[in-house]
């Protein structure tokens, strides 16, 4: 493509992170923004220097604007993701959507169907996959240092009570009705990417609300989910949106048949200092060794941190840009968006049923199940 990619943003709060990256990227321009909040829209209009004609209160007007957008980045509440993604795809516009893909299984299916019908690129913006530390883990796995991965942990403990309920007015926000385990892609995303696997069964427990009892299911004190993968591995995930913790943490661990890796449990941030972790490789080490996992991509430009989360958002945006420029499928395509979203939806159902194990359906059109460890599981694509 000659010239610049015309990028539209919907949902200025989260979308502004990618807006800053698109604004600075030499091959992109922010060609339109949309938000139902007039104050937020005006603020980001000023930040990006956009004319009034490029700012919209209605998403349909952004999608229909001329000259036509090449791509749209969706940063709205999750309940709108599927509908807005499908609308853009049907208009011939590429889509990068914030996580998770949808709040329903049907929404995820509609995204897959729209991509196949319209032929445009869809990518889930699961930024944790682009944390540099996971490149180190991928190297160890590809070199066979850890053996076969048999177990993973992915805890996301992030108290955000003020984003569930307004502490002054008591108004409930949309996250108040999102079960903690619904928001699973930050946890299972990088592990499934490293394992090249998908989840076939899920269960979860946790329904008590003692910390923020007046809110919805999003204020459940804590939820624990267990997942079984197609290759027979087990993943454990713990999630809270209200339990007090400083600092919030993403904790990850992978156990293989020859060793393990894990991150810090103390809530290390996205800094140039990286974070301490552990590694053990059988036959090379007498015991687990402490080391520092990198958290910033040293090869990224100086403005790469404008999106936030270190250089993760930059890595996500560049991967999307590469996909629409080359026509290659991103790893985080519509099918893997299903794999990173639906297990959390099924786990939430399990929690409502007292922790019953439930099958996680394969994406529409996936290969038929095969036997793994004596159970039915979906074949790896």
For each feature predicted by the language model, list its residue ranges.
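Glycine-rich, aromatic-lined ligand/substrate-binding cores of catalytic
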Residues: 196-271
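Conserved SAM-binding strand-loop segment of SAM-dependent methyltransferases
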Residues: 52-59
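C-terminal helix-rich "cap/oligomerization" subdomain common to oxidoreductases
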Residues: 1, 61, 71-73, 319-381
């Amino acid at each position: 493509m000659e010239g610049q990619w015309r990028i539209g943003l919907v949902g200025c709060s989260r979308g502004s992170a990618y807006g800053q990256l698109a604004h600075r990227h030499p091959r992109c321009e922010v060609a339109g923004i949309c938000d139902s909040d007039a104050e937020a829209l005006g603020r980001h209009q000023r930040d990006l220097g956009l004319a009034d004609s490029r700012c919209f209160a209605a998403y349909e007007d952004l999608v229909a604007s001329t000259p036509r957008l090449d791509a749209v980045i969706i940063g709205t509440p999750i309940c709108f993701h599927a509908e807005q993604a499908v609308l853009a795809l049907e208009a011939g516009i590429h889509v990068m959507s914030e996580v998770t893909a949808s709040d329903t299984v049907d929404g995820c299916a509609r995204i897959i169907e729209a991509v196949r019908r319209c032929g445009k690129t869809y990518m889930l913006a699961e930024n944790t996959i682009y944390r540099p530390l996971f490149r180190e883990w991928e190297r160890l796995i590809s070199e066979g240092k850890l053996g076969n991965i048999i177990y993973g942990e992915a805890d996301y403990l992030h108290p955000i009570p003020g984003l569930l309920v307004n502490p002054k007015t008591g108004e409930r926000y949309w996250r108040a009705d999102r079960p903690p385990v619904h928001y699973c892609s930050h946890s299972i995303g990088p592990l499934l990417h490293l394992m090249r696997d998908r989840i076939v069964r899920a269960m979860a427990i946790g329904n008590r609300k003692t910390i923020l009892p007046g809110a919805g299911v999003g204020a459940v004190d804590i939820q624990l989910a267990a997942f079984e993968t197609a290759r027979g591995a087990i993943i454990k995930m713990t999630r809270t949106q209200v339990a007090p913790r400083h600092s919030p943490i993403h904790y990850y661990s992978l156990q293989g048949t020859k060793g393990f890796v894990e991150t810090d449990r103390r809530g290390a941030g996205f800094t140039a200092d990286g974070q301490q972790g552990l590694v053990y490789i059988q036959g090379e080490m007498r015991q687990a060794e402490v080391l520092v996992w990198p958290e910033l991509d040293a090869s990224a430009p100086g403005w790469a941190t404008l999106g936030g989360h270190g250089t993760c958002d930059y890595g996500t945006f560049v991967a999307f840009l590469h996909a629409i420029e080359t026509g290659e499928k991103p790893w985080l395509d519509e099918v893997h968006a299903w794999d990173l979203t639906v297990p959390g939806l099924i786990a939430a159902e399990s929690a409502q049923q007292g922790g019953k194990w439930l099958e996680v359906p394969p994406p529409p059109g996936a290969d038929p199940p095969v036997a793994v460890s004596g159970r039915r599981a979906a074949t790896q694509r």
